[in-house]
């Protein structure tokens, strides 16, 4: 249990910050100790427990934030200039265009844009993109970590290898295994498309390789060598489940290297959701574990945009997930397995990698912690056992896989962590990306909804829309453009530079209270190639 001073000083500091910025303070005991009134917009993945939570406060909406500042006794201005805003927004952006052959792009994917905007320090989100070299297709994914970034980092490095191996034919697996045994160079199976900030752990590479090799050896033994078509859905499910199993096993076995031993335990005790797309020609598979989302942007005949959801959130808002959990455990746990819209009253996503506190037996948890390094044994969170923990596992990493056959009207796919979906409706996301890609945004009338707008306000909105053209041209990345809207949109749906500047100026200790990490990948499809596939079949 943290010492009283450890609980006291964070509380005092955040109360002081709330007075400086005019915001409500939601303290460790969940008492509102500062004005103005506070209504949470969204909740974090973990509900605090006195055993390991010293301070907790959910995010507020921007409206509550600005209202609080409006009446602050000493208002403080901290505006970033447009170049400074752009520097922050573009720091993590990455774009990839599929290369052409003989002046033609024969892939159903034109390319993709990705970007990240941190709220946590360090950011807990991760992203990955790679082209499969020994099989057809491209893999793209976003990973949302919680209780730290260790698990999301490991999954972002490893999952695509497990998927690629699961898709390989028997003869290719044999060729790779023979190359390892004879010390020859291995066939490359993935070509990564990475931002310079997207790193791989060199220290853990050998450990990860050995676990992956054990997996493909088992696949070789299971396969008789007969040429059979590989089921992509089954391959995705097997890859997700096997990686999660390896994460758990590595933590149980440990490692002689003290650094690696602590690393595998950090990975296992933290958690991550994953939303991965595999695109092969017109075949699009989305494998989702958790509450990140995949959204398809469809352009209708009249030029309007519609959003098609290709994933389901695995949380309390999904009645099928709640029912699944209740059916997997005894009836006397029906009221405790999902409590306050959380798994065992603690965890928001009902599916995730890692999070062994919701998977291992109590005896196994105690045994691993007691034999682990001091950092783990001294950590109050790892020693805390969830309440009503009777029949584990309560959590799974098994993905829900959705299949969609691409059509010419399917223009793009948005993969994003929940930091985006908490701030924007799916239809707005698709419309903004669609208008950005087609340059049609300026033709849309201004929508004011039920707001009463004066002539002066309307003039301001028209001025903003004119200025919006320049922001589109300065954004060379669709994901960056979407983040700009997610963080800077006002109540009329236009980017407000003052608001955007304020949100990006928040200090680290306040940023997480108003938004989450945001990670986005926008995949643009090649309508001509997709249409050619369709014509060939007809």
Swiss-Prot record:
Q: Which reaction does it catalyse?
A: O-phospho-L-seryl-[pyruvate dehydrogenase E1 alpha subunit] + H2O = L-seryl-[pyruvate dehydrogenase E1 alpha subunit] + phosphate
Cofactors, names only: Mn(2+); Mg(2+)
Matches recorded under SUPFAM superfamilies:
PP2C-like (SSF81606)
Record-annotated PPM-type phosphatase domain positions: 109-525
Classification via Pfam families = PP2C
Superkingdom of the source? Eukaryota
> What's in the keyword line of the UniProt record?
Acetylation, Calcium, Hydrolase, Magnesium, Metal-binding, Mitochondrion, Protein phosphatase, Transit peptide
What this protein is called in its record is [Pyruvate dehydrogenase [acetyl-transferring]]-phosphatase 1, mitochondrial
Q: Which organism is it from?
A: Bos taurus
Q: Which gene encodes it?
A: PDP1
């Amino acid at each position: 249990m943290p010492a009283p001073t450890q609980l006291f000083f964070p509380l005092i500091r955040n109360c002081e910050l709330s007075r400086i910025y005019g915001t409500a303070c939601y303290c460790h005991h969940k008492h509102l100790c500062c004005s103005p009134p506070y209504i949470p917009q969204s909740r974090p993945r973990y509900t605090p427990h006195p055993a390991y939570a010293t301070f907790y406060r959910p995010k507020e909406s921007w409206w509550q934030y600005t209202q609080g500042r409006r009446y602050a006794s000493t208002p403080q201005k901290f505006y970033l200039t447009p170049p400074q805003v752009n520097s922050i927004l573009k720091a993590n952006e990455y774009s990839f265009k599929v290369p052409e052959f003989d002046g033609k792009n024969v892939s159903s994917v034109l390319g993709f844009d990705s970007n990240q905007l941190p709220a946590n320090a360090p950011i807990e989100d991760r992203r990955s993109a790679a082209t499969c070299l020994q099989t057809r297709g491209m893999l793209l994914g976003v990973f949302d970590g919680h209780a730290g970034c260790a698990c999301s980092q490991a999954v972002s490095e490893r999952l695509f290898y497990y998927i690629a191996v699961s898709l390989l034919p028997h003869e290719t697996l044999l060729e790779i295994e023979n190359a390892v045994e004879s010390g020859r160079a291995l066939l490359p199976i993935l070509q990564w498309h990475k931002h310079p900030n997207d790193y791989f752990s060199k220290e853990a590479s050998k450990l990860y390789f050995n676990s992956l090799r054990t997996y493909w050896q088992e696949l070789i033994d299971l396969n008789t060598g007969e040429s059979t078509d590989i089921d992509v859905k089954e391959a995705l499910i097997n890859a997700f489940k096997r990686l999660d199993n390896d994460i758990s096993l590595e933590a149980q076995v440990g490692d002689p290297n003290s650094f690696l031993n602590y690393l595998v335990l950090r990975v296992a005790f933290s958690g991550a959701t994953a939303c991965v797309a595999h695109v092969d020609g017109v075949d699009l598979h989305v494998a989702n574990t958790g509450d990140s989302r995949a959204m398809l942007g469809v352009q209708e005949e009249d030029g309007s945009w519609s959003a098609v959801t290709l994933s389901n959130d695995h949380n309390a808002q999904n009645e099928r997930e709640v029912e699944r959990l209740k059916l997997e455990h005894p009836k006397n746990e029906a009221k405790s397995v999902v409590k306050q819209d959380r798994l065992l009253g603690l965890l928001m996503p009902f599916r995730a990698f890692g999070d062994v506190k919701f998977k291992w037996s109590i005896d196994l948890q105690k045994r691993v912690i007691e034999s682990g390094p001091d950092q783990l044994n001294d950590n109050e969170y790892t020693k805390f056992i969830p309440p009503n923990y009777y029949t584990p596992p309560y959590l799974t990493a098994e993905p829900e896989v959705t299949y969609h056959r691409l059509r010419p009207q399917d223009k793009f796919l948005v993969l994003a962590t929940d930091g985006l979906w908490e701030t924007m409706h799916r239809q707005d996301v698709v419309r903004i990306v669609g208008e950005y890609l087609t340059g049609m945004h300026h033709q849309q009338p201004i929508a004011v909804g039920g707001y009463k707008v004066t002539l002066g306000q309307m003039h301001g909105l028209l001025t903003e829309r004119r200025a919006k053209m320049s922001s589109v041209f300065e954004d060379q990345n669709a994901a960056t453009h979407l983040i700009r809207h997610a963080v800077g949109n006002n109540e009329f749906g236009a980017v407000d530079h003052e608001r955007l500047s304020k949100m990006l100026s928040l200090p680290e200790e306040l940023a997480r209270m108003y938004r989450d990490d945001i990670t986005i990948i926008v995949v643009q499809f090649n309508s001509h190639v997709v249409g050619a596939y369709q014509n060939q079949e007809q």
